[in-house]
């Protein structure tokens, strides 16, 4: 599911912003919530954008890489 919906992953400050196909931010955000990363304070989804609030700037790169790895793994196996 993740590979078919996420277009890009970028970060700014302690936020990670994921752009998705129209209408698919909600299911992708739910998946991120279910991953239960301790460093993630919360996830908010609109129609085609997801904001992931990270607990401190020092964890942003780690969480962004995990999400990018998840996206790449889904592309390889689907």
Show where each model-derived region lies.
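Non-DNA-binding regulatory cores of transcription-related proteins
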Residues: 1-64, 70
């Amino acid at each position: 599911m993740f590979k078919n919906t996420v277009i890009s992953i970028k970060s700014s400050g302690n936020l990670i912003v994921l752009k998705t196909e129209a209408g698919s931010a909600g299911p992708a955000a739910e998946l991120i919530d279910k991953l239960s990363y301790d460093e993630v304070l919360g996830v908010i989804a609109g129609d085609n954008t997801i904001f992931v609030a990270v607990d401190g700037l020092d964890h942003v790169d780690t969480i962004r890489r995990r999400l990018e790895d998840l996206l790449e793994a889904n592309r390889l196996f689907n």
